[in-house]
Structures are given as structure tokens and as C-alpha cells.
């Protein structure tokens, strides 16, 4: 009789992310010799309701950012929780680790430790059954490649520039395939670089690979992007749309610091706006530019404001909740009940396990909303999010610029998946967006 597959050993180690900060990597070894390895990413602009990323706090080591305690939890408590269990039962594995932690926000053992083991288990299980990860998780229906939401200009917390808006992205909706979408986007990226250089701007890149020029205003960034799309030979508002991540919670918090609670401070330019002025501002930008998606247009605590924003712009553009929902089904279901936003950004480490991530995607899609699988600003060479995007047929991925290996690794994995799927591969283009009827 064939021996049942089980988890035999779990290893943990401290490695570096793309910002030079330590993160947790886990390695799961199965009874048949199959191995899975995964690393936890890390964010710079984080939501208050995210699961806890455990850091050592020892200022004498990595300026307090070490993760040796989290690594110890991988080797001890989490290893004890999962060893001997069947790796093909992901739900049970994740539940065992969540129980071992015993807190609401994974604050005892760390979401970074739990997530690394969770993803490594899925990878080991996929290897054991000789399937690529996207197929192991998604079955034969996993064949939709995502439209990239490609970051080409960085601002906010992600860059030392004068831009308040954190990310300006392009979406190649007019392409016929993922590989063509990547080629078109990269052409726009290089065209933008030429334009910036010609006008004397520095073309150094931010955390996510986009340029970080010292522009005078956020609108200037949009002007340059529209020009780059045209100069590259494409049509703005047809071949390409623009997406923005305002990371407005940062603006809300900055206003609080100067005693203007409930308002929004564009801290790099000094402008203070009320909720209604913020909504007017976003609407004006949408009227002027081919904007299709706005992420975190208001703060994570501002549910009333979000309601107004959704009423005003929800039928026109994709309104994405990131800090608002933090990949948490409790918060997503509140958003659904209150009809707030129409899209959810999905980040594994906000919730801290694969099962909970997949549940969040399922809940979002069942509502008829869009789900965007996303990286963090602190990434590694780990490409799991590429497989998850295809496994869940999410239709959209946010994983930075076509520069920096930590970002490009995900695009390259999607190219491999597309080639492997062959004729079965689907690139949704405009169909990925509910608002583009």
C-alpha cells in the first residue's frame, strides 16, 4: 500500500528583499522528497488593519528590521503544527498554523512566518503531484493571463519625488495576448524614459521600478504618460488606460498630524483638501485623462467618503480598495454590504495565508467585483503571485515596472505560463474591466 504523502520537515531562513530589508523564507520538504520554497514580501505603505509582520526590533542588527524571531517560529511552532500533515490539504495546513498563532492578526508567530510556510507547502504539493502551481491550485480552468497594471512613475512613499500620488500605472487593454501586452507596455516605458531624459529629468527608479522624476505636480506625470503612449504608437483610452494608486490614507494621516483630522493633506505640495474636494479632484482627473482605475482614492477609515466616491465614480472607473480591505473577508463583506468600491487589491501578506487569500478572491469575484493580485514594494525573486493570478483567473496583476529583477521575475513567469498553456491561454484585455462595457 502506498504511503500517504506528508510534510516531513520545515526549514526557515532570513533572506533579503528588494529594499535590502530582511524577510522570511521557508522551505517545506515532503515525505516523497518534493520541496517547496517561498518568501514573504513586505510593504512600505501599509494598512492599519493588515496582519502583523514580525520584526525583531534589535537596533543593533539590520536597524531593528531583522526577522530571526519569525524564522525561529517557522522552525519550531509552525513546523510542529504542520509536520506529519497531508500537504495536499492546504485548508487544514493553514488552519493548523492560524490555531498555533491564536491571535486575530497573526501577531504572535507573524504573518510573514505563516505566509512563507503556507506558500512553500502549496509549491511542494504541486511538485509532488507533478503540476505547475497555477494548475495545482486552479485546475484545468486556470488559463486567463492577467492584464498588467504596470507602474511606470513612482511617487508618495515609494519615491523621493515631489509627487503625492504613490503610483501611476499603464494598462495594455488593447493587446491580443499577454506577451504582446508586455511588449507594448515595455515600449511605452522606454519611450517615457527617452522623454524624461530629453527634458533633463533624472531617470532613476523607485521601489517598484517606475521612474521618480522631480515633477511639479501629479498632473505633470499624467501628461508625460499620455505623451509616452502616443509617441510609442498607441492610442490612450483605447490601447492603453491609466491606473493610479493614491494611497490616500497617507494623506489623511498627514492632515491629522497638523490637526486637520478628516481632511487630506497632499504633503509634498502642501494642499489641504476636504473629502468632497478629494472626490471632485479625482473626477476632474478622470474627465481630463484616460483613467480607468483608482486605488485607495480615500483613507481606510473614511467609509462615508468612500460611499460618496463610489456613488460619483463607481459606474465609470474601477475603484480599488487596498488599505480599505487589506485582503480581509470581514472587511470585504462590509464593503459589499455598504456598496463601497467595486474592486479589491489582493496581497497575500496583508492576511497571511494562502487559504485566506483565495477566500478573499472568491468573495470578491462572487460579488461581480474585480480582484487584482498584487506585489508589495518590498519583493524577492519569488514568483508565486504570477501563478495565483492565473490559478484564480483574476484577470489583473499589479507587479511593478518592466525593470528590476524582483518585478520582472513575475512577468517572466507569466510568459512561461502563457507558453505552457499555448492555444488555451486567454488574455482578457478590456473584458477584465467591468466598467468597460
Curated annotation (Swiss-Prot):
Annotated (2R)-2-phosphoglycerate binding sites: 166, 347, 376-377, 398
Localization annotation: Cytoplasm; Secreted; Cell surface
Active site: 208 (proton donor), 347 (proton acceptor)
GO molecular function: magnesium ion binding; phosphopyruvate hydratase activity
Pathway where this protein functions: Carbohydrate degradation; glycolysis; pyruvate from D-glyceraldehyde 3-phosphate: step 4/5
SMART domains (UniProt xref): Enolase_C, Enolase_N
First-listed, main subcellular location of the protein, grouped into a coarse class: cytoplasm
Keyword Ubl conjugation set for record: no
Protein's job: Catalyzes the reversible conversion of 2-phosphoglycerate (2-PG) into phosphoenolpyruvate (PEP). It is essential for the degradation of carbohydrates via glycolysis.
Family from the record: Belongs to the enolase family.
Protein name per the record: Enolase
Species whose genome carries this gene: Lachnoclostridium phytofermentans (strain ATCC 700394 / DSM 18823 / ISDg)
Amino acid at each position: 500500500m502506498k504511503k500517504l504523502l506528508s510534510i516531513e520537515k520545515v526549514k526557515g531562513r532570513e533572506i533579503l528583499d528588494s529594499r535590502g530589508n530582511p524577510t522570511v523564507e521557508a522551505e517545506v520538504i515532503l515525505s516523497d522528497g518534493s520541496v517547496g520554497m517561498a518568501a514573504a514580501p513586505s510593504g512600505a505603505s501599509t494598512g492599519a488593519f493588515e496582519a502583523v509582520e514580525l520584526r525583531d526590533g534589535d537596533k543593533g542588527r539590520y536597524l531593528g528590521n531583522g526577522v530571526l524571531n519569525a524564522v525561529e517560529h517557522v522552525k519550531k511552532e509552525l513546523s510542529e503544527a504542520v509536520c506529519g500533515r497531508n500537504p495536499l490539504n492546504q485548508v487544514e495546513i493553514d488552519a493548523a498554523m492560524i490555531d498555533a498563532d491564536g491571535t486575530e492578526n497573526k501577531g504572535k508567530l507573524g504573518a510573514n512566518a505563516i505566509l512563507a510556510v503556507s506558500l512553500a507547502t502549496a509549491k511542494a504539493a504541486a511538485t509532488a503531484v507533478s503540476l505547475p502551481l497555477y494548475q495545482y491550485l486552479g485546475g484545468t480552468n486556470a488559463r486567463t493571463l492577467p492584464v498588467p497594471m504596470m507602474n511606470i512613475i513612482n511617487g508618495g512613499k515609494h519615491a523621493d519625488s515631489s509627487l503625492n500620488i504613490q503610483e501611476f500605472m499603464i494598462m495594455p487593454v488593447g493587446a491580443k495576448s499577454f506577451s504582446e501586452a508586455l511588449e507594448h507596455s515595455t515600449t511605452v516605458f522606454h519611450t517615457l524614459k527617452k522623454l524624461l531624459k530629453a527634458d533633463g529629468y533624472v531617470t532613476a527608479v523607485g521601489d517598484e521600478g517606475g521612474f521618480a522624476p522631480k515633477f511639479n505636480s501629479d498632473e505633470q506625470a499624467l501628461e508625460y504618460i499620455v505623451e509616452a503612449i502616443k509617441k510609442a504608437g498607441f492610442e490612450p483610452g483605447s490601447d492603453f488606460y491609466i491606473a493610479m494608486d493614491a494611497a490616500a490614507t497617507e494623506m489623511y494621516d498627514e492632515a491629522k498630524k497638523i490637526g486637520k483630522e478628516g481632511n487630506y493633506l497632499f504633503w509634498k505640495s502642501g494642499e489641504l483638501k476636504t473629502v468632497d474636494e478629494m472626490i471632485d479632484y479625482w473626477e476632474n482627473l478622470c474627465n481630463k485623462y484616460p483613467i480607468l482605475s483608482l486605488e485607495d482614492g480615500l483613507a481606510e477609515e473614511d467609509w462615508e467618503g468612500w460611499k460618496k466616491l463610489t456613488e460619483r465614480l463607481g459606474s465609470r472607473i474601477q475603484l480599488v480598495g487596498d488599505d480599505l480591505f487589506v485582503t480581509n473577508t470581514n472587511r470585504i463583506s462590509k464593503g459589499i454590504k455598504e456598496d463601497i468600491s467595486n474592486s479589491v487589491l489582493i496581497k497575500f501578506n496583508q492576511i497571511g495565508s494562502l487559504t485566506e487569500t483565495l477566500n478573499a478572491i472568491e468573495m470578491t469575484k462572487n460579488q461581480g467585483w474585480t480582484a487584482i493580485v498584487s506585489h508589495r514594494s518590498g519583493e524577492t525573486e519569488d514568483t508565486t503571485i504570477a501563478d495565483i493570478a492565473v490559478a484564480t483567473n483574476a484577470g489583473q496583476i499589479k507587479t511593478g515596472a518592466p525593470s528590476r529583477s524582483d518585478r520582472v521575475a513575475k512577468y517572466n513567469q507569466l510568459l512561461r505560463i502563457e507558453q505552457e498553456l499555448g492555444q488555451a491561454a486567454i488574455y482578457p484585455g478590456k473584458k477584465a474591466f467591468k466598467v468597460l462595457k
